[in-house]
Regions:
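A short beta-strand micro-motif
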Residues: 22-24
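Extracytoplasmic
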Residues: 2-17, 28-93
Length: 93
């Protein structure tokens, strides 16, 4: 049985560096996605040059707002693993 800490385990497979989407959170309120982005930019200066997208999605009838970054070339692995090490949600897909 996987523990809840698994969401913060680093990605071990280097193939994840080719993933083009890095999701930094999923929120019930759009404003929370915007606030999270501002906080992450303060904590991680390398994010200041990035432009996020907030994607509205419906899961089991509930609306969520996903905070994501896109990159055609990937390259998110190192940053995502650093975020996970700091217990910040980060999914590569």
């Amino acid at each position: 049985h996987a523990g809840s800490d698994d969401i913060f385990a680093p990605y071990a497979d280097p193939a994840y560096d080719r993933k083009k989407v890095m999701q930094l959170g999923s929120y019930v309120e759009r404003e929370n996605a915007d606030l999270e982005w501002k906080m992450l930019q303060e904590l991680y200066p390398e994010l200041r040059s990035k432009t996020p997208e907030v994607i509205r999605t419906r899961i089991n009838g509930q609306i969520f707002y996903r905070l994501v970054l896109h990159s055609e070339s990937g390259g998110f692995l190192s940053l995502c693993n650093r975020l996970r090490g700091d217990r910040v949600q980060c999914l590569l897909r």
